[in-house]
Amino acid sequence: GRIDVFLNDDKTVIFRDNGIGLKEEEVYRFLTVIGESSKRDTPDADDFIGRFGIGLLSCFVVTDEIKVESRSAMGGQAVCWCGKVDGTYELTSSAEERPIGSQVVLHPKNDWMHLFEYDTFKKILVGYGEVLPYPVYLHHQDEEELVNTPSPVWLAPKATRKELLDYGAKVFQSSALDVFRIRTESGRVEGVLYVLPFRTQFSVRNSHKVYLKRMLLSEDDCNLLPQWAFFIRCLVNADGLLSTASRESLVSNDLLKDARKEIGMAIKDYLRGLVQNNRAMFNKILDVHHFHIKAIASEDNELLRLFMDYLPFETNKGVRSFGSIRSADNVICYTRNLEDFRQVRRIAGAQGWLVVNAAYTFDETLLKKYARLNPELTLDEI
């Protein structure tokens, strides 16, 4: 199959495919109830037409008329559905010979002509359709150009780490510390996650790319990432999740929740693997993202045991790993607020004590949870 997009000099646009087309009965069933498909928020809506309704309706933002012409591979005459912005439509059939498949014809309003300038139009077309599984050709002034990559490197099983890092740097205009693959059963999410090379705050929204059935959905993470995963940038495609009616995000349901849980486990498995097999990379990530690693460890006892010795804590003798703090004494002295720490640090230094400043987010929680898991340790709050 293929998709051909024709941008004419008068800015008329034709989207044409060589698919199986629609019979008159199917045109009537689907197009005359155009809003219906956008309201079906169940997997049953995942049929061969798909959830196209709101997408076709959105054409009325830039045009007063939508024309759909189709001829079915199952036989019958070609049909033409012409919808008007006032809600009326006309459905006709034609004995005229036309190729099997469908095409959508749009005549843009004057106010939106700027979107149909060649460079702007091509940028939008590439942005949304770059990884569609069928070749997309843009035709303009007798020239034809392939504008997508049906087999993108980030979905290629044999792509190397360098290829994935180079692709991410090109797409996001930023390098990454590392990259790893994910695949979920829930929602059939597949792609790669990049580890950001700079510190991030929980309130900052990073740039992502989320595709739904290989078409760009959003540059937000669409709630696919756990709340603590702000050090991760995702480049993923979901074949089994549902979009909202506006096609700006994913429907928040149990399927999305399960997919997010699987992605969270994949991130934890990745970090666990680094601790066991690539300590140098783990240390690089820890240097930049120790705050987020602490957040992960605070909610997962297994990872707490695995990560705790490597996590940095401020003490009156400088920043030290918990492993070095623990090796100094089985009694760990700490303060729970910054003012107390400032008051005792000089006295503690003179007495030769090691005192942890646990005023930072997660630090006291981590100390208490680790002590509960390791009875040989004693916490002494000063």
Task: Give the label of every model feature segment.
Residues 1-115, 316:
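GHKL (Bergerat-fold) ATPase N-terminal catalytic module, capturing the glycine-rich phosphate-binding loop
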